[in-house]
């Protein structure tokens, strides 16, 4: 039979995972296939995500992924179906916006550094920005983010609450 996991594994081995470049990340997070150890798996389903500060690069990575899976499937007379959903589009809040200046002022009052950074994370703010509403995402201070060792501290949570109080 046609070994779907074999084709999928070959495709995954050709993909660049993690930080593809400074603006884009790519991850295959789940792989499911097969029904028993003595049966050739005729289906394999993978899920993953692409995040990028540049929407065009995200779409380009989707097209590249589809091409690679199709090529590897064709090598063993299988088929590949790649579906994608756009959950969010990257945005940038201007440094001169009221959101930024209010944030920096609150941080100064509290003695916090008020560091502005980019993030590959998604939030409700992506939807707000898409609809012309400027804002910032205030981090809860995650360590080892998106790993099995992810955590935060009570102190970081407390400081976050202080900052929110100052902004209100």
Q: What kind of feature is each model-predicted range?
A:
Residues 54-55, 87-89, 108-111, 146, ...:
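A short, structure-level motif marking secondary-structure boundaries and short turns
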Residues 31, 112-163:
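Zn-dependent metallopeptidase/amidohydrolase metal-coordination segment
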Residues 9, 59, 63-66, 101-104, ...:
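Generic alpha-helical structural signal
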Residues 1-92, 119:
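Midchain, well-structured core segments that form catalytic/ion-binding scaffolds
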Residues 1-4, 96, 150-157:
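Short, conserved glycine- and acidic-residue-centered signature motifs
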Residues 9-19, 62, 88-136:
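Active-site-adjacent substrate-binding region
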